């Protein structure tokens, strides 16, 4: 049986740590990658096609897109949607980075055995606790796992274990190397956060590039050389969309019709938008112990993208790119995939979200209609 390993990723942006992860994996590698909107509620620095090209250049065999309402979700829902897509494509293994050395297969077995009891435990916890707090308390109670507050990939890995429970998927945790959430460029593997900060120190307030290829020397030690030039591609960040968000919040009298926005949050948002000067300031004004900053960023993304309370996820899987080996996987999954969005639509919410994303930089190309999967050139 051919080993097919799934990787769930954002690659925002792709760096040497991601290359290291791919190099640790044997067999065929399928990446389920967030599109143009990220799990923690922010636009991707580079568009989905640019990031898919980076992944293919550095070892991925097939890159498929996570629909926007899988990618912009809390960890459990993000993991569940992504694992379902990868399982549908026939993965045997799921690889991910983690700060912990625990056996995640054992964790998946515990959840499979005690799912009902564990979910009931969460529901019985006080409402004033945030969902991440409840989830961590559940894991601590049933497995004895301890959290030190600085293990974001460990938390996500537990969500993968939960999503993979009972699906006959082998979990392969790869030890993280370097400071993956540091905001500074240091020796060794730099974090995506540090790279984004460095890139936007070289751009104007709406993300328009102020540098040429010759100015990429500040990051060249942290990026695979084969994709360094790709870093000169058009970029964006929340600064480009904040005026649109201000307009939406100020004029929409029914924000509670947006996904996960309740009356309390609607009032908080209406009040906060009067004084917030930028996106980060708005998040600071709205968040509470119960409504974490990550949750508020996602809510603001839902508002910008006009996500309704009820929606359906697409059945087909959108292909962003593939290698020769990846083409074999596609051949085995005809009927499940969509390779070109045009006469046949894919996911209305994702396609509309991409239209809004394009407003973030005048140099962004059309994101869906007429775009064909990237085919990796074999050496």
Curated annotation (Swiss-Prot):
Membership in a protein family: Belongs to the TmcAL family.
Role this protein plays: Catalyzes the formation of N(4)-acetylcytidine (ac(4)C) at the wobble position of elongator tRNA(Met), using acetate and ATP as substrates. First activates an acetate ion to form acetyladenylate (Ac-AMP) and then transfers the acetyl group to tRNA to form ac(4)C34.
Cellular location(s): Cytoplasm
GO BP: any one term: tRNA modification
UniProt lineage: Bacteria, Bacillati, Bacillota, Bacilli, Lactobacillales
NCBIfam families reported for this sequence: PRK13670.1 (NF010191)
Species this chain originates from: Lactococcus lactis subsp. cremoris (strain MG1363)
EC number: 6.3.4.-
Major subcellular location class: cytoplasm
Keywords: ATP-binding, Cytoplasm, Ligase, Nucleotide-binding, RNA-binding, tRNA processing, tRNA-binding
InterPro entries named in the record: Rossmann-like_a/b/a_fold (IPR014729), tRNA(Met)_cyd_acetate_ligase (IPR008513)
GO cellular component: a single term: cytoplasm
Protein name: tRNA(Met) cytidine acetate ligase
PANTHER family linked: TRNA(MET) CYTIDINE ACETATE LIGASE
